[in-house]
Design a protein with these regions (language model features):
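Short, glycine- and charge-enriched coil/turn segments that flank and shape catalytic ligand pockets
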Residues: 1, 39-40, 102-112, 172, ...
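N-terminal basic, low-complexity leaders that serve as flexible interaction/assembly modules and, when applicable
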Residues: 1-90, 225, 309, 329-343
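Generic structural hydrophobic/aromatic packing signal, biased to beta-strands
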Residues: 10, 20, 69, 96, ...
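N-terminal small/glycine-rich loop or linker at the start of catalytic domains
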Residues: 14-45, 75-90, 96-102, 138-175, ...
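A gly/proline- and charged-residue-enriched helix-loop-helix capping module
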Residues: 91-130
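Active-site loop segments of alpha/beta catalytic cores
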Residues: 116-343
Length: 343
């Protein structure tokens, strides 16, 4: 894949125009996705059908001019493999029937076995069969902290009060759980690479719940352990790693470490200031506010070209959203965004 704009950017090689992909590019805003989704009462059942996942991953590739595909799956597959009882029902977010509510629940967890997630690895293989040979596939996982937050809370939440209380009352038990998740994430990502992904992204979707100090203690140190293991492993050592931290309270420049190829910026982050601070030492991905896609074509053009002009001379720039695309977006607005970034 020597001619991949996306992989070139991750190696800090200049491109004539920035490579483009976007978070949740296969998803609910696409009518063709909805046609398949209506056949499943539980989203997770759909994720467990590799051929269906491959079709869904290809939908945005067939519709738009994109430079990378991302595996169609969910970040919560690891807690589900730990027997926490994950389910997604129409109109609801994720729910766990067996959440972590006390330290003893961690001691009685079943051992993580990546083979229970063979449906994910089969989805990688099926997706690679359908993708153009020159188009990279991104694999991913949630960060240990983000997976722990969902697992303790029992699902999504506005304030994650149960998780914060658990962190305050049982920090040692939480660290034990984070170690389990850390090892599981490494093994999970390693198997994705063996199955054919070309790059990896770690989503710390609940980084914003933590103070700057707690982010280092409960999140970053475990993310670093994952990347260190990946970079020490002959199977995965050459695979680029992207980190997405959602609106962290730490400076972004303090979140960059040697094993990362790319930092993916939340839309609230100042991409101009950050690009000047890191001085071409790491690829930067982002960071259009997804809400801009609800605006007029003129405003979309202005915002996209503002970001692209800031990053014009930055060799490792990947155009993306600063968070996942929302279900209400008209696909034609995505087309406008891509056209603006290509000019």
């Amino acid at each position: 894949m020597n001619d991949s704009k996306f992989l070139n950017a991750l190696e800090l090689k200049p491109n004539s125009t920035p490579p483009i992909w976007f978070m949740r590019q296969a998803g609910r805003y696409l009518p063709e996705y909805q046609e398949i989704r209506k056949n499943y009462s539980n989203f997770l059942d759909m994720c467990k059908e590799p051929k269906t996942c491959a079709k869904l991953a290809l939908q945005p590739i067939e519709r738009f001019d994109l430079d990378a595909s991302i595996l169609f799956s969910d970040i919560l597959t690891i807690p589900d493999a730990l027997n926490l009882g994950l389910a997604f029902h129409e109109g609801e977010g994720p729910k766990f029937s067996n959440p972590i509510s006390k330290p003893e629940d961690i001691n009685t967890l079943i051992s993580f076995d990546e083979n229970t997630l063979s449906y994910v690895f089969n989805a990688v293989e099926e997706t690679k069969k359908l993708l153009p040979a020159d188009l990279p596939l991104i694999g991913f996982c949630g960060s240990p902290w983000t997976l722990a937050a969902y697992s303790i809370e029992g699902g999504g939440s506005k304030d994650f009060k149960k998780t914060k209380n658990f962190m305050q009352d049982h920090p040692s038990a939480l660290h034990d759980f984070l170690e389990i998740l850390c090892d599981a994430c490494y093994r999970y990502l390693r198997q994705q690479v063996l199955s054919g992904v070309n790059a990896l992204q770690i989503f710390d979707s609940w980084a914003d719940l933590l103070s700057a100090q707690d982010l280092e203690i409960f999140s970053l140190q475990y993310t670093k352990k994952i990347t260190q293991k990946l970079k020490s492993d002959p199977i995965t050592k050459n695979i680029p790693i992207i980190l997405f931290e959602k609106d962290p309270k730490q400076k972004i420049t303090d979140l960059i470490f040697d094993d990362l190829s790319c930092i993916s910026l939340h839309w609230k982050n100042d991409i101009e200031a950050i690009s000047k601070s890191v001085k071409n030492n790491i690829a930067i991905q982002g960071n259009l506010n997804p809400m801009i896609l609800s605006e007029s074509d003129e405003i979309i053009y202005q915002e996209v070209q503002r970001i692209c002009s800031i990053m014009f001379e930055y060799p490792g720039f990947i155009f993306n959203l600063g968070h996942g695309i929302t279900p209400d977006i008209n696909p034609q607005k995505v087309q406008t965004m891509i056209k603006a970034a290509r000019e």
